[in-house]
Amino acid sequence: MQHAIQKTAKKHLINDPALAHAHVGIAIHDPSTNKYTYQHQADKLFIPASNVKIVTAYAALKNLPEFLPSAVWTELDTAILITPMGDPSFLHPDFKKHPLFDRFKSASKPLYMRNDNWNTSAIGNGWSTDDYNEDYQAERNAFPVYGNLIQWFQERSIKENPTTPQDTTDTFIYSNPEINWSVDFGKSSNNFQVKRKEHDNFFVLSEGKEKSATQAVPFITNGLLSGLTLLKDSLGKAVQIADEELIQYSKGQSGIIINSQHRDSLLQKMMYRSDNFYADQSLLMISQLLLSRMDEAAIIQELIKKDLSQLPVKPRWTDGSGLSRYNQFSPSDMIVVLNQLKAEQEWQKIKTIFPKAGQGTLRALSDKREEFIYAKSGSMSGIYCLSGYVLTKKGKWMNFSIMVNNHDSNTSTVRKKVEAFLQSL
């Protein structure tokens, strides 16, 4: 079998002209024997892109409870102190129920939120500063609100009674949530567009010709300030930032954890659409639970030492999402994570969280078999990676990791090469 795999690996990946300048790493592992059936540069480090989310999902399944911890609610004599836990689902449009918001509404005492458990930055190390306006790079913080995004909408309709031949259309532009921040209008164009200033919550709206259009734009979080401003408008009352005196007074007082969404529901969304925000905040939630502070560098070291001590090649793990080009993992590292995941979690749960061919970010992958692959892709400029579980023609599930770095082809071409190789197994 190894010789046959080697032959097809050379045909579709290693010696293919489209990948002539690329670095390719391949690992195929049989979990039933715990042996590799094929390796090619499997011990080399590669930029994994969103394959990092496999590691984050593993850590979340191992360390987060069944329902996500949203905040610690500590009731004092004259106030309520809230300790945020990094939950990305609070008031996120993905979810209909928000237990913490209901608590806020019913509270009769003044509400205060502590901000002394945040020990990292809004933008991750190695993230592209040019992408500040893109919805896939929302800022991280201790208490996300609305996914730290403003959803903008444009609706156009035909006027019933136009005043001039040119004035035939009504255009309505609005946001969710509504904001009181600065807004200006730019030059109209074919496509609706919203551009935020890089260092300010100032949004420039350009009307498009579409009948309906939408765009999500990250807002600057300013720690807790921006989110609490939006929350005040939605809640109808303020949640203030706690001072040191109140924090000290609360010491020794017990609080209760307010839970939010089902963990696996969030992880499925994270894996299906490769949601960077959910991934990075999941890592910060783990950090808050285990270290009592949100610090991705510290929790990464803790996880490598504790849960991922069997990794054969020490990775350079930087964030939860894979947005950072500083991340480096080997294919053999990914195999260990996949193997541990399958050993520790129910197979049905893995199949629910991981997309299969034709679903999510694997929707372009196709195969006649009902089950062929459950995996996570990852791509950046010059990078395509795919790791997960593949069903061979002989009906055996194998762990696999394929990492392609520094290619000069388009992603679609590389993806098809990887797909052809996997279908040959």
PLM feature segments, named:
Residues 37-39, 258, 283-425:
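Small-residue-rich helix-loop
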Residues 26-28, 70-74, 387:
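Short beta-strand scaffold segments in enzyme catalytic cores
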Residues 62-313:
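Conserved serine DD-peptidase/penicillin-binding transpeptidase domain
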